[in-house]
């Protein structure tokens, strides 16, 4: 037997704080919790909702920092300080090798923050080779992190870093950038939706991650807000320093991911709409030529991999090298 129902109601909420109030009023059956609400519940075993918690499944998207290499100010002039900084390899390496994001991850999974860590441009489970090996495991091997396992304590990319190595990398970046006129701290424009307390708290925690990782003399998040549309108000005017965005698989092949960041392809979504690297490549300044050369090499590797259509294993290996 089955029982029928007349309708299903979907409630649109402004942020999770409002959603929690609706849940308490029994107007919602389930809800994702903000970090502060989750902390309140888990710190009190007698809390009425303490036994109603469950860890939600990982997102199906691969979330990444997407740098903007052609950042503009609100008046339409180039944000030269950021553009020079982000074109520098040592500066970008500091993000990958020295930025501790565990407090930021805790905003999305308070209990097991490092389950939010993403080490690959492609999400897990997209495709497997003939031996049943996940494509991202092939990427891990190329990155030299295939032996690193989840330990719940340390981000994978930080395990080979030391305070001295990061200090040296930071000094290298600052020396190289000072030589071309960059002033410090470099302000990284980062936007969140106005009126959303959870988004504001997320951005504030992320800003603190930069402070804790590098100090305030190197990189600082310059927080800004948009009213309703990130695309219309931030991305299209090219105001962002970087955007955190997730990409899911439209089809089960690595080109669905890495193909979004190549040059000379108007369909490369991230290259055209987020990083704006194609605009830089048209007439790169001296400080951008190494960056463009790296993208050219990456583009060649992706195109070479995409041309392999008769050997799936070789295709995946080639994409992993890219």
Task: Set out the residue ranges of the language-model regions.
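Extracytoplasmic/secreted cell-surface and envelope-processing proteins
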Residues: 20-21, 39-43, 65, 74-78, ...
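Short, well-ordered beta-strand elements
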Residues: 5-11, 184-195, 221, 241
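Append "and occasionally in soluble cytosolic enzymes with long acidic Gly/Pro-rich linkers
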Residues: 86-212
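Short, solvent-exposed loop/turn segments at the edges of secondary structure
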Residues: 3-5, 47, 55-77, 81-86, ...
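Periplasmic binding protein-like
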Residues: 23, 28-30, 47, 209-273
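Extracellular/periplasmic solute-recognition and catalytic clefts
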Residues: 9-75, 102, 106-108
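Extracytoplasmic/peripheral linker and loop segments enriched in polar/acidic and small residues
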Residues: 92-93, 97, 101, 105, ...
């Amino acid at each position: 037997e089955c029982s029928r129902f007349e309708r299903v109601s979907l409630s649109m909420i402004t942020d999770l704080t409002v959603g929690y109030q609706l849940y308490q009023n029994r107007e919602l059956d389930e809800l994702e919790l903000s970090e502060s609400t989750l902390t309140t519940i888990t710190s009190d075993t007698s809390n009425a909702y303490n036994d109603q918690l469950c860890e939600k499944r990982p997102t199906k998207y691969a979330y990444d920092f997407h740098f903007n290499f052609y950042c503009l100010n609100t008046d339409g002039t180039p944000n030269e300080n950021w553009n020079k900084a982000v074109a520098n390899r040592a500066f970008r390496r500091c993000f990958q090798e020295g930025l501790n994001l565990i407090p930021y991850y805790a905003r999305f999974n308070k209990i097991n923050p490092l389950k939010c860590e993403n080490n690959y441009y492609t999400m897990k489970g997209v495709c497997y080779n003939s031996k049943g090996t996940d494509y991202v495991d092939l990427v891990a091997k190329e990155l030299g992190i295939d032996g690193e396992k989840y330990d719940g304590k340390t981000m994978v990319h930080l395990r080979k870093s030391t305070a001295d190595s990061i200090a040296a990398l930071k000094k290298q970046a600052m020396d190289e950038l000072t030589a071309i006129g960059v002033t410090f701290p470099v302000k990284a424009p980062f936007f969140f939706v106005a009126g959303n307390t959870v988004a504001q708290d997320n951005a504030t925690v992320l800003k603190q991650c930069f402070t804790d990782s590098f100090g305030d003399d190197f990189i600082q998040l310059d927080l800004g807000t948009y009213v309703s549309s990130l695309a219309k108000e931030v991305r299209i005017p090219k105001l962002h320093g970087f955007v955190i965005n997730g990409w899911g698989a439209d089809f089960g092949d690595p080109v669905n991911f890495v193909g979004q960041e190549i040059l000379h392809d108007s369909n490369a979504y991230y290259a055209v709409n987020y990083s704006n690297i194609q605009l830089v490549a048209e007439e790169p300044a001296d400080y951008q030529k190494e960056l463009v050369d790296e993208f050219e090499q990456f583009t060649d590797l992706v195109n070479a991999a995409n041309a392999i259509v008769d050997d799936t294993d070789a295709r995946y290996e080639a994409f992993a090298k890219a």
